[in-house]
C-alpha cells in the first residue's frame, strides 16, 4: 500500500463510510419503526420489501453509468447523494413530518443510490490495486469496513435510539451523512478513472509500478 497511498485513502474512505451507513440504518430500522412509529413487531418485516426493491433497482438502473459516465463521477455522485438524502430524511424525522410509510419510502430512495455506492466501494478496491496484492487489499478494506460498520454503527445507533430522542437519532444520521459526503469528495479528488480499461492499465503489476 506504500506505493498507492491515495488509492488506499480512497478505499478506506469508501469502505468505512458505506459500511457505517448501510449497517447503521439497515440493522436499526426495526427499532425506529417500533419505538418511534409504534409499528407492531409482527408487521416490521413488511417494511423490508421496499428496502429490497431499492437495493435491487439501484444497480440495475444506474449501474451501467459507472462505465458510460465514468467511475469517479458516479462514485462521488452516489455517495454524496446518499449522504444528502439521509440528512434530509433525518431533518424530516426530527421535525416529525413523516410517518412509518413515508420514512420507509425515504429509506428506499436513499438505498437506491446507496446500494450503488456500496457496490462501487468493493469494485474500487478490487480493480485499483496491482494483481499481486488485490486479494489482500480486498480482505483488508473489507475487514476495516466490517469493523466500523458491523460493530460501531449498530451499537451507536442502538444507544441513540434507546434515548427515545429524535434529536439524538438525528445526530447519528448527520454523522453517517457526513461520512458519505466526505468519502464522495475523496473519491472525486483522488479517484481513478478506471472505466473501459483493463485491470493492468488501471494498476500495473508490482514488477513495473513505481511510486505514485
Spell out what each predicted region is.
Residues 100-116:
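Hydrophobic core of transmembrane alpha-helices in multi-pass small-molecule transporters
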Residues 3-59, 149-154:
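Extracytoplasmic gate region of multi-pass secondary transporters
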Residues 116-129:
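Intracellular juxtamembrane helix-capping segments at the cytosolic ends
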Residues 59-70, 161:
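Helix-to-loop junctions at the C-terminal end of transmembrane segments
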Residues 131-163:
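A late C-terminal transmembrane helix in Major Facilitator Superfamily
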Residues 81-97:
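C-terminal ends and interior cores of transmembrane alpha-helices
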Residues 159-178:
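A membrane-interface helix-boundary motif in multi-pass transporters
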Residues 68-79:
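Cytoplasmic membrane-interface "Motif A"-like loop-to-helix N-cap segments
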Amino acid at each position: 500500500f506504500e506505493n498507492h497511498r491515495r488509492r488506499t485513502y480512497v478505499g478506506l474512505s469508501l469502505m468505512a463510510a458505506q459500511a457505517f451507513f448501510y449497517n447503521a440504518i439497515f440493522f436499526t430500522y426495526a427499532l425506529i419503526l417500533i419505538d418511534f412509529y409504534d409499528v407492531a413487531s409482527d408487521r416490521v418485516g413488511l417494511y423490508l420489501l421496499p428496502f429490497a426493491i431499492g437495493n435491487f433497482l439501484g444497480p440495475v438502473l444506474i449501474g451501467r453509468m459507472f462505465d458510460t459516465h465514468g467511475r469517479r463521477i458516479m462514485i462521488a455522485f452516489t455517495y454524496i447523494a446518499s449522504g444528502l438524502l439521509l440528512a434530509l430524511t433525518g431533518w424530516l424525522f426530527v421535525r416529525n413530518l413523516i410517518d412509518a410509510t413515508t420514512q420507509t419510502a425515504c429509506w428506499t430512495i436513499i438505498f437506491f443510490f446507496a446500494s450503488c455506492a456500496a457496490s462501487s466501494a468493493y469494485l474500487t478496491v478490487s480493480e485499483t490495486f496491482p494483481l499481486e496484492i488485490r486479494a489482500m487489499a480486498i480482505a483488508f478494506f473489507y475487514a476495516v469496513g466490517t469493523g466500523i460498520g458491523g460493530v460501531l454503527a449498530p451499537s451507536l445507533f442502538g444507544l441513540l435510539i434507546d434515548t427515545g430522542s429524535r434529536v439524538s437519532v438525528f445526530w447519528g444520521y448527520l454523522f453517517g451523512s457526513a461520512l458519505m459526503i466526505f468519502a464522495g469528495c475523496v473519491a472525486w479528488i483522488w479517484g481513478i478513472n478506471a472505466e473501459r480499461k483493463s485491470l493492468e492499465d488501471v494498476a500495473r503489476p508490482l514488477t513495473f509500478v513505481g511510486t505514485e
